[in-house]
């Protein structure tokens, strides 16, 4: 539920390496 400061409209979340995932075109962590 914490925004990772990255969008995932065009590309996947690069922050997925630190546990972030794409939700509603924005990368979130928990």
From Swiss-Prot:
It comes from Viola odorata (Sweet violet). Keywords: Disulfide bond, Knottin, Plant defense. GO terms for biological process: defense response. Belongs to the cyclotide family. Bracelet subfamily. This is Cycloviolacin-O9. Probably participates in a plant defense mechanism. Transmembrane segments: none annotated. InterPro entries: Cyclotide, Cyclotide_bracelet_CS, Cyclotide_sf. The presence of a 'disulfide through disulfide knot' structurally defines this protein as a knottin. Disulfide bonds join 4-20, 8-22, 13-27. There is a cross-link at residues 1-30 (Cyclopeptide (Gly-Asn)). This is a cyclic peptide.
């Amino acid at each position: 539920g914490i925004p990772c400061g990255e969008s995932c409209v065009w590309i996947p979340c690069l922050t997925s390496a630190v546990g972030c995932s794409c939700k509603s075109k924005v990368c979130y962590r928990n």
